[in-house]
Curated annotation (Swiss-Prot):
The gene is cap2. This is F-actin-capping protein subunit beta. It is found in: Cytoplasm, Cytoskeleton, Actin patch; Cytoplasm, Cytoskeleton. One of its GO terms (cellular component) is cellular bud tip. GO terms for molecular function: actin filament binding. Component of the F-actin capping complex, composed of a heterodimer of an alpha and a beta subunit.
């Protein structure tokens, strides 16, 4: 049984249901979909809705959509990245992160004990070789987390493939919540390692989910939420199984550095410019008022905004004709 919906989620259910029904009716108007096509339509409509809704409410939005169309639950959970949740391992008393890659039914596998909580007798666990790599990777990224994040929670999960293995590196750091501020950073790095002669081919898909909120009586409320995904492929030399941990660590470190710089220089930089422009308009209006008052005192008529725009347009046309 799904958990009961909150009043906000129930309101969202109605909105999502109307949007999904609209998409379905639109496709039905143009085509005569088969049952398979109908499932694809609903899945695409759900993804389209999630892209348009506030990223900080992804969990509630997923809950609302899956309560309408339960058949989409598995596909949506495996396709949509959402903020990571923390659980404590009952055996080792250490925190670990939950995701679709360490889930089996309603149970989650701890990377520290390799056991499921709630207990699961026939849960899927990695082979002995891959489990050893998983343990080594958790130790390595635990150090990485302390050095780069100075706290937070991290977890690494590996699983077997026919021609190699795959894994996911999870990192979560939250801002210490104050009275009017909050924030979270979630990193999800999924990779595949294909074994070759003295080499390994790595495919890495990295996603960062960021939420920052601040409220101030003087400046008002600010909410920056979103996610960004980047991919890369590379061939690296492998001398032993330990080389995989070093290679994956280097790839994740480089990718996180690039994504941090991109967020800071492009996204935060653009947001800063927009906020600066909004804050400068009241000052500009105040300056214009003072200038007009000065013109009145000197007996000069101020140049209208229309004349200024015309003069700018004429100057632009002249520069293009040169």
């Amino acid at each position: 049984m799904p958990p009961p919906l909150s009043p906000r989620a129930r309101t969202l259910v109605g909105q999502v249901k109307r949007n999904v029904q609209f998409h379905v009716e639109l496709h039905q108007y143009n085509t005569n979909p088969t049952p398979h096509t109908m499932a694809d339509i609903q899945f695409d409509s759900a993804l389209d809705l999630l892209r348009r809704l506030n990223p900080r409410d992804t969990k509630q939005n997923l809950q609302a959509i899956t309560s309408i169309v339960p058949d989409l639950t598995e596909d949506l959970l495996s396709s949509v990245d959402q903020p990571l949740e923390i659980r404590r391992c009952p055996k080792t008393n250490r925190d670990y992160l939950l995701c679709d890659y360490n889930r089996d039914g309603d149970s989650y596998r701890s990377p520290w004990s390799n056991e499921f909580d709630p207990p699961l007798e026939d849960g899927t666990v990695p082979s002995e070789r891959v489990r050893k790599l998983e343990v080594a990777a958790n130790e390595a990224f635990d150090v990485y987390r302390e050095l780069y994040y100075e706290g937070g929670v991290g977890s690494v999960y590996f699983w077997d493939l026919d021609d190699g293995f795959a894994g996911v590196i999870l990192l979560k750091k939250g801002v210490t919540p104050g009275a009017k501020s909050s924030g979270e950073w979630d990193s999800i790095h999924v990779f595949e390692a294909t074994d070759r002669a003295r080499m390994s081919h790595y495919k890495l898909t990295s996603t960062v989910i960021l939420h920052l909120a601040n409220e101030n009586e003087a400046l008002g409320e600010m909410d920056l939420s979103g996610n960004m995904t980047r991919q890369m492929e590379v061939d690296l030399p492998v001398e032993s199984d330990a080389s995989h941990v070093a290679n994956v660590g280097r790839l994740v470190e480089d990718m996180e550095l690039k994504m941090r710089n991109l967020l800071q220089e492009v996204y935060f930089g653009k947001a800063k410019d927009v906020v600066g422009e909004l804050r400068s308009k009241p000052l500009l209006c105040h300056g214009r008022t003072k200038a007009m008052d000065a013109d009145k005192n000197t007996g000069l008529a101020p140049l209208s905004e229309t004349n200024k725009e015309k003069a700018a347009h004429l100057e632009m046309i002249r520069s293009m004709q040169r």
